[in-house]
Amino acid sequence: LSEKLTLKQKQDEEYPKIIRSDSILFACTGTIGEKFPLEKIKNSLPNLVDNIKYNQNKLIWMKAASGIKTTDTKPKLAMSECKIGNTPIKVYGIAKGSGMIFPNMATTLGFIFTDANLSSSILKNILKDTIETTFNAISCDGDTSTNDMVSIFATNKANNSEIKSHKEKKLHD
């Protein structure tokens, strides 16, 4: 196993994947009155791309959740495993936000990831059906902000059976 993992890492380093610019998502809640640091981000991109690793360890989700904190005191993350049919599926979520949280999210950013094989339209409908009783139900201090976002992504790496509707029973069992 050790030799296989070492070989895989070497292959990833020798044949890096190309990341298209339209595959990068930026999210920011910002501080009222402060200009978005576009130049700082633009100048940091080459270093970020050079340091991407394709074989991350289990701590990657903690690192990601910690990386998006602003005034949060702790990283916010969750992980769950379930099945679509007989296929095991993983779902991970990370979020940031500690103040100015009121229904409709305010300064909360949430990112949900799954390895399930689901189309973007299925993901969109799942998120739409669940957002009102989850993220949009959060209240911290009664203040709202103009910056909010929850996104859902599927890598489609799982080999689950095709899902044709977000209402399918096998998604809810």
What are these model-predicted stretches?
Residues 150, 155-173:
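A glycine- and small/hydrophobic-rich beta-loop-beta segment
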Residues 130-137, 149-157:
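Membrane-embedded hairpin module used as a gating/binding unit in multi-pass transport
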Residues 3-10, 14-135:
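Glycine-rich, mobile lid/loop segments that gate access to catalytic sites or pores
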